[in-house]
Each structure stands twice: as C-alpha cells, then as structure tokens.
Amino acid sequence: MSLYPWQEKAWLELNPSARKLHHAYLLIGPLGAGLVRFANVFASSLICKNLTDYKQACGKCQDCQWLSTEHPNLKVISNESEEGASKNISIESIRNIKKFVELSSHSIGGKKVILINNIESLTVNAANALLKNLEEPPENSYLILTAQNISSLLPTIISRCLMFKAPTPSADDARSFLKAE
C-alpha cells in the first residue's frame, strides 16, 4: 500500500525514522482524504525491517507479506462492523490492547503496533480505558489513532499523543489522481 500523491510531503514531515518514536500518534483528517491509508502506511513502516529509501514498508519482506493478510504484531480496531451492529468502539476492544501487547513479539525487538481508526467513536468507558494505555505505554508498542474531528475527544487523550494533521487533496490533486486511476 502506498501513499496518495498529496500525502507525500506530509509523510516526510512525519517520517518515523527521522526522529525518536513517540508512543502514541493522533492523525487527524477529513473523511475521504485518505487518512486510513496514511495510518496503514505508517503502521506498516513501523513493522517492516527493510524500509525503502522513502522510509515506507518494502512490501517484500516476511513482515510485509504478513501485513497483506494479518500480522501478529499489528492490531487494528475500528468502528466498522456488520450491518445492525454497534458503530461504537467498545471498552472490550480497548481492553484487548493490554492482552495484545503482553504477547511476545514474533521477532526479537519487534514493535507492537495498535491502529485505532475513528477514535471519536469510542464509548466513554472505552476512552477512559484507552487513556490508561496512553499513560502507561508498554515498551516497544505504538498507538496510531485516527480521527476526523478532535472536539469530542478527551483532552487528556489529545495531550498524550503527538498530533499530526493529515493533508487534504486540492481539487486539482484529486482530479489528477482520479484521471490517472
């Protein structure tokens, strides 16, 4: 999976290999701007051990092969569910993070990455449980959170994350991309 063209400059700003990693990132962007793709590329780059010159996952190593299906060091939580099911992220989903990070990594020194999409859909109890994970992050584990709007988030969650505003394509960028596809 690669970035959209309008995300490339932002990737260089976020570039996880250019700085010391923070334990939690909050990526903010509007619906339809490719925020989930950006978050997935970020998560993949934290797990891949053979990054490209552009500091993205290589797509070829064993870790990348697993990422294309289900990687044992990546947990994705989202409010996307079966029709008729709850559209909120439950406290149980957040509590499972603790169990996930307690499992040993499949490789020595491997990172555990938790990607939570649409965190504004956390229940109140789930938000409080997430806060516990943010306050006491396990070693070698990283949280990537996505949100369209931070106004409904607990200020304490926001304050414990490195916030990053994902880019929105201009009308020209969007047209060019769609024509190329």
Tell where the protein language model's regions lie, with residue ranges:
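Hydrophobic residues in beta-strands of the RecA-like P-loop NTPase core, especially within AAA+ ATPase
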Residues: 27, 116, 130-131, 147
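Short regulatory helix/loop adjacent to the ATP-binding pocket of P-loop NTPases
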Residues: 125, 129-134, 149-162, 179
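A generic "binding-loop/recognition-motif" signal
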Residues: 118, 149, 170
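Conserved AAA+ ATPase "SRH/arginine-finger" region at the nucleotide-binding site
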Residues: 78, 163-173
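P-loop/Walker A NTP-binding region and its immediately flanking N-terminal helices
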Residues: 1-119, 142
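AAA+ P-loop NTPase domains with strong preference for DNA replication initiators
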Residues: 172-181
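Conserved catalytic/switch belt of AAA+ P-loop NTPases
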Residues: 102-105, 128-145
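Conserved TIR/SEFIR loop-to-helix hotspot centered on a Trp-containing motif
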Residues: 122
